[in-house]
Amino acid sequence: MSENLIGYIDDQGNIIDTQSAGENCTARPIEFDNSEKSLEIIRHSTAHLMAQAIKELYPDAQFFVGPVVDEGFYYDFRVNEKIGEEDLKTIEKKMKELIKKKYKIEKYEISKDEALKKFANDDLKQAVLSRIPDETVSIYKQGDFEDLCRGPHVPALRFLHNFKLTRVAGAYLGGDENAEMLTRIYGIAFADKESLKSYLKMMEEAKKRDHRKIGTEMELFMFNEESGAGLPFWMPQGAKLRYKLEQILHKAHLVRDYEPVRGPEILKADMWRTSGHYACYGENMYLTEIDGQEYGIKPMNCIGHIQIFKQTQKSYRDLPVKYYEYGVVHRHEKSGVLHGLLRVREFTQDDAHIFCAPEQIASEVLEVVEFVDSVMKLFEFEYTMEISTKPEKAIGDDEVWETATQGLKDALKGNDLPYTIDEGGGAFYGPKIDIKITDAIGRKWQCGTIQVDFNLPERFDVEYVAEDNSRKRPVMLHRAILGSFERFIGILTEHYAGEFPFFIAPTQVIFVPISEGHAGYAYGLKKKLMLEGIDSEVSDKNDSLNKRIRTAEKQRVPYVVIIGDEEVQNNTVAIRNRRTREQYNLTQDEFMVELTKQLQEGKI
């Protein structure tokens, strides 16, 4: 057995650790490195190492769950003392001491009844056991520490040298906002020191780019806890940025033969029952009663588009029919997962639904992929695609799901477009392609999606007249390019660190007259630019020239234009170009040509 062997992958893509595999395992080996599967094992084991250290430092600690997550790992636990960020170094030190003891990580199994007796005085373990349907449970042990766990884990602590505990948070037991608040510590781990250093450097840069910090500095958006968590307010600068983004997408939809529509934001609950949302998504919906009838505020836009499609009879000649809407939706996200614009309870999707014949699936999916590609290139994002398959909670039979999933695979394979598979990650009504983008500092984000749906047309009896005059069901493609305006703007803000491209910058030009006598010239230029669709302002408040320039720089305005005697006399402008960091003078006409050229860069 190789010294670097830490597990195996079976034919279904499941990880088997060395403790579970046996000596003659024929599955594909997982070596100790920074591959996805290897990191999953390393990070899960580091979570247990952290728990062991916490137990030694705080003997009264009781542990709930410690999973691997996108940003590393965490453990939820109960402890009598308050643990803060300042305690993380002490816990890390203890973890390093434990590694030096060279403990192996061992696994044994007992019956669920035995486990209930073993952990009879630990209500958190009782809660974990209540969620396990199996009659046998596994326990992993290192030194004197042991914990309920299904694995996978590395063979020994010697693999866990490269880690960092990143933050302390609170977390409700089981995610239930009415339950007890536990302590949660997050961490990260890698196979080597250099990868850890690179990650920590990226996280330092991420702090500087935090969209919540930049959004406050640039006065883009705000939140008000008195009004409700997860409900953003768009301030004038943010609303201008958002409007520009909406307009770019609006024109791009029209040239691709989409038709704008709009549906109500609240529908009778029976509609959501028919669609399956009530049963499969009801816990995320806001429900209310009006005139004795139950209604649901929409969490998705698809039902409205179905009603519009059904309003008039459609022929095969009409297909594909493509509707798009900037649809406001509401979803009940738990307070613990809310995060600035990236996770909110009210948001606007750039949502579209394509009704097409089955034989049109591949061409329509490819057209959407082309649309995605043009948007991502515009904003300098690299991206990958992931096909997500049938989840546990789903509507429709397996055969329909298989047909839909294969349709997505065929569309991408047939055009040599690479993709990965996310087993069980689909929407409840159909498989999907998720668009994963990579930002300027290497972080990955899930944004757009393309979903194939045979189920909702069946449930709502959607039909079109075929060439032979028979009635047939269309296929429904759900798609969003950005995902939501809120999330995408949050990501854009961090991607560009607030230095937005000229064509979407909230204020694109700000004129700073040196004295009151120069203000008239500045306002004349502002009007000229505004008529050409260029957002401009005049900063003529009763502040010093330097303060007004600093304010414009803080707002990251692409062009700061100083107006003095020379500019007024010669009909010129003195420019400070934020992107190039250059200062230069142009005539009014030359300046207009430069701005118009940059404005044109925002077309897709």
From Swiss-Prot:
PROSITE patterns tied to this protein: AA_TRNA_LIGASE_II
Function description: Catalyzes the attachment of threonine to tRNA(Thr) in a two-step reaction: L-threonine is first activated by ATP to form Thr-AMP and then transferred to the acceptor end of tRNA(Thr). Also edits incorrectly charged L-seryl-tRNA(Thr).
Protein name: Threonine--tRNA ligase
Cofactor(s) this protein cannot do without: Zn(2+)
Co-factor: note: Binds 1 zinc ion per subunit.
Gene3D superfamilies: 3.30.54.20, Anticodon-binding domain, Bira Bifunctional Protein, Domain 2, Threonyl-trna Synthetase, Chain A, domain 2
Annotated gene: thrS
EC id: 6.1.1.3
Compartments, record wording: Cytoplasm
The protein's assembly and partners: Homodimer.
Organism per entry: Sulfurovum sp. (strain NBC37-1)
Chain residues that bind Zn(2+): 302, 353, 478
Transmembrane segments: none
Alphabetical list of InterPro entries matching this protein: aa-tRNA-synt_IIb, aa-tRNA-synth_II, aa-tRNA-synth_II/BPL/LPL, Anticodon-bd, Anticodon-bd_dom_sf, Thr-tRNA-ligase_IIa, Thr/Ala-tRNA-synth_IIc_edit, ThrRS_anticodon
